[in-house]
Amino acid sequence: MNGVPDLELRSRTGGSVAFAVRDLDGRRVVVVEIAGEDRGALRPADGENLAIAARTARDQRLPLVCFVESSGAAIDEGVAAVHGWGTAAREFVACSGVVPTIFCVTGPTVSGPALLLGLADLVVMVSDTYAFVSGTHMVRQFTGEELSNEGLGGATMHERTSGVAHFTVADRAEADDLIAELLSFLPDHTDQVPVGWPCADPVDRPTPEAADIVPDTATGSYDVRDVLACVVDDGHLLEPRSQWAPNLVTAFASIGGRPVGLVANQPQSVAGTLDIAASQKGARFVSFCDVFNLPLVTFVDTSGFYPGKDLEWRGMIRYGAQMAFAYARATVPRVCLTLRKSYGGAYIVMDSRYMGNDIMLAWPSAEIAVMGAKGAVEILHRQANEAERVDLVAAYEERLLNPYIAAERGSVDRVIDPARTRSELAAALEVLASKRERIPRRRHDNTPL
């Protein structure tokens, strides 16, 4: 699109919103700027401009990128300003699943405009900004708690605690570069597939170092990102929400020049177990990749769901079901690789064969079972003495934890040499490139929110 002039559609004359169709690193996108007078306070016309911008992106099938700094609805306009925000929110919802929507917080963003962040596919926050629905004054009135703006809704908090921020950056220039890179992995809209690029990293490059990263013992810790870096192009990972729910890694990458979404248990954080935040993180990422036609590659090394009264009381059942729901309805190419342990319900929801993946691979070190050998023996043979339990554990491992047994039973397609992981994944993605699934028409699914 180089050489095509920008098209300014709405200026900020008398308001806080401007938008245009612009070139962003070779991609035509609808760019919205929410700022301007009165610290970006939204008046009724601003809400209408936001709605028109979202509608333009949807109708023209172009990604929607919003830069926001807003103090909320203009109080002197009365309830009409809130009505305008509602109109905008409805149009942003209509963009969901149609075009990629990326928000960048460039300054303080509060009240209704902050809620728009929750409607975005990806959120970038400049490090010295903050965002919240109810401000520090309201918190003090209702709870008596004294908080700073940063303490209540700073970029660091949203990156590590709430999960609202997928990325934080130093400034607007870094945000522009990051957004351009994110868009390079994505199509313009849901009816396109992501465009690949030439790859100088050979797809048949051996990866013997990958197996060396994973400890021989089932309980040894390691950073799964080191394994991912071994198998993707040039070792490059772009990891949204890297600081939130660190027990599950999600990342954009490419294999053989083909953009993919990666999901992986992280053994160095709570043994790679799934808790509420990890389930939310994984489900949202899987759903995002599915709607924008990014193939999914899942790397499994988990001992199950994280146990505890607090999680059960907060709804672990509902949130764990989100992972199952997201994978089960995904129609993009799906390849799963078990690196080491894969136990219990978490084994099933991490895109197992029974969630409907296309190709199921395993390393020779894989252990696929209801639980680990030691725990199983303690339940099945409670009366056994210590010496007997050692033999029983060994027998259980040989009989049930062997990946070749899983392959014989159809739970695994192939047990692969770790040194061939990159080439095996590249070959699988090539075979699945033409995959298309028809989905029965229905109004919409009822996601377990």
Please report, for each region that a protein language model flagged, where it lies by residue.
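Ligand-binding clefts of soluble mixed alpha/beta catalytic domains
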Residues: 1-449
